[in-house]
Swiss-Prot record:
Keywords: LIM domain, Metal-binding, Nucleus, Repeat, Zinc, Zinc-finger. Gene3D superfamilies: Cysteine Rich Protein. SUPFAM superfamilies: Glucocorticoid receptor-like (DNA-binding domain). Residues 39-100, 101-160, 161-220, 221-283 form the LIM zinc-binding domain. Interacts with CREM (via the third LIM domain). Interacts (via second LIM domain) with SPAG8. Its main location: nucleus. Disulfide bonds: none annotated. One of its GO terms (molecular function) is zinc ion binding. One of its GO terms (cellular component) is nucleus. One of its GO terms (biological process) is positive regulation of transcription by RNA polymerase II. This is Four and a half LIM domains protein 5. A zinc finger (C4-type) spans 8-32. PROSITE patterns: LIM_DOMAIN_1 (PS00478), LIM_DOMAIN_2 (PS50023).
């Protein structure tokens, strides 16, 4: 190799007896190599010279001494780290800043570990257990009561009410009648079997009936119009000699004047006002 062949490719200075760098079969003095080829450090913005270690992550470069956690500033050299929003964080800082806390043990749920979510809270998989049997619930069905979560078998064993009709567990809601509880969809009219949830109803011998069935089967009938006398919503009725009338139906059988609060006479089965009953063969 001649002396000219041992010169810096860029500045042509002789490299005899000097340090140099060989790149792509070309020789460079240290000064030229650093100026032309050095990467710039993400942290300090200075060139990473040939005598320094260049640490690279996703086409970004750092001096070894600048490769630190963005929050606690501890070195990340040969340590696990996480990149978030262009920042490098050690696992401890990432966990404190970005990870969820377990609702049960209050410890950090580490990135990459499995976590369970329920009603906006998070648990370690091993902390998300049935309040009674302490077995992991995982993705199985569960029922919440007060501050605890229960697997279905434990909840049914400890707390559940059973429907008076179908004898199955009532997990939520329900209707109570005569100290018994029903599913909403099981509380039916004893006559026509329609659902009574959010409906007015009457009872007979401890059996519930919708108003139509109760009136048809059990309500007294008006002696005038023959329609049921329900007594609902404060309705008034008149009773005389085992007969009943709606107050608006208690009228003179001849002139139809109201007899409510008035004296009246009877003729056979007919009710008459005093005027119409005068001179007739009547009973007082």
């Amino acid at each position: 190799m001649t002396s000219t062949q041992f010169d810096c490719q860029y500045c042509t200075a002789s490299l005899l007896g000097k340090k140099y760098v060989l790149k792509d079969d070309n020789l460079y003095c240290i000064s030229c190599y650093d100026r032309i080829f050095s990467n710039y450090c993400e942290q300090c913005k200075e060139p990473i010279e040939s005598d320094s270690k260049d640490l690279c992550y996703k086409n970004r470069h750092w001096h070894e001494g600048c490769f630190r956690c963005n929050k606690c500033h501890h070195s990340l050299v040969e340590k696990p780290f996480v990149a978030k929003d262009e920042r490098l964080l050690c696992t401890d800082c990432y966990s404190n800043e970005c990870s969820s806390k377990c609702f049960h043990c209050k410890r950090t749920i580490m990135p990459g570990s499995r976590k369970m979510e329920f009603k906006g809270n998070y648990w370690h998989e091993t902390c998300f257990v049935c309040e009674h049997c302490r077995q992991p619930i995982g993705t199985k069905p569960l029922i919440s009561k007060e501050s605890g979560n229960y697997c279905v078998p434990c909840f049914e064993k400890e707390f559940a009410h059973y429907c008076n009709f179908c004898k199955k567990v009532i997990t939520s809601g329900g209707i109570t009648f005569r100290d018994q509880i029903w599913h909403k969809e099981c509380f039916l009219c004893s006559g026509c079997r329609k659902e009574l949830y959010e409906e007015a109803f009457m009872s007979k011998d401890d059996f519930p009936f919708c108003l139509d069935c109760y009136n048809h089967l059990y309500a007294k009938k008006c002696a005038a119009c023959t329609k049921p006398i329900t007594g609902l919503r404060g309705a008034k009725f008149i009773c005389f000699q085992d007969r009943q009338w709606h107050s608006e139906c208690f009228n003179c059988g001849k002139c139809s004047v109201s007899l409510v609060g008035e004296g009246f006479l009877t003729q056979n089965m007919e009710i008459l006002c005093r005027k119409c009953g005068s001179g007739a063969d009547t009973d007082m």
